Amino acid sequence: MPQFILLLRDDRAAVNGSSPEELQQLMYKYQDWRRTKATGGQKLMDGEGRVLQKQNGKPSVIDGPFAEAKEVVGGFFVIEAANYDEAVEAAKTCPHMEFGTIEVRQIEKT
């Protein structure tokens, strides 16, 4: 069955406005969702990251975090679905929709 990656982009303002209790409840929702829908996934480290880009023909590294971005990739899930429509329907049920966006991309078989 095809695999899809769900890239979870956090709206930092929404996350920062949540109480510790609300965040704990959200983590429980993530755990339940992952057990039933995902074949893999991880939360990414807060405040870490590097972007590589070519400058003057050579790789250049920019350190994160990227505070100027309204949304940052905060994690990902890998799911199996028959097609994009099914993957999108699964993504709609992800608790991440409460405070962020989800990009759905099919993983190419190698």
Can you describe what each PLM-predicted range is?
Residues 1-110:
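Conserved, structured core segments of small domains
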